[in-house]
Design a protein with these regions (language model features):
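Catalytic core of pol beta-like nucleotidyltransferases
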Residues: 1-16, 25-30, 41-94
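A structural signal for short, well-ordered beta-strand segments
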Residues: 19, 34-36
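P-loop (Walker A) phosphate-binding loop of NTP-binding proteins
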Residues: 22
Length: 94
């Protein structure tokens, strides 16, 4: 799964991506979604349609529901948990 995610983000305006939640902890069930925290490359604007396309394409590639969250937009109650769980799955080469 992490290789599919990394390969996909190589073609997207993403600088870094982390897996968090149940998949990061190895506690996923058949009902779990894939939680991804991303740092976008804002050198060019990322609109709603591009964001929605990434979300849809990730779901298609993984065959799972995906929760795609931009870094800095997690709700306050989820920040500590996400930071504890998160595992880097992609970082753009410099």
């Amino acid at each position: 799964m992490t290789q599919i995610i990394a390969d996909y983000f190589k073609t997207q305006p993403v600088l870094k991506a982390w897996l968090f939640g149940s998949y990061a902890r190895g506690e996923q069930t058949s009902d779990s979604d894939v939680d991804l925290l991303v740092e976008f490359d804002h050198s060019s604007p990322i609109g709603l349609f591009a964001y929605a396309r990434m979300w849809r394409e990730l779901q298609e590639r993984l065959g799972l529901n995906v929760d795609l969250v931009e870094e800095g937009t997690l709700r306050p109650f989820a920040v500590d948990s996400a930071n504890r769980d998160k595992k880097l799955v992609y970082e753009r080469a410099s």
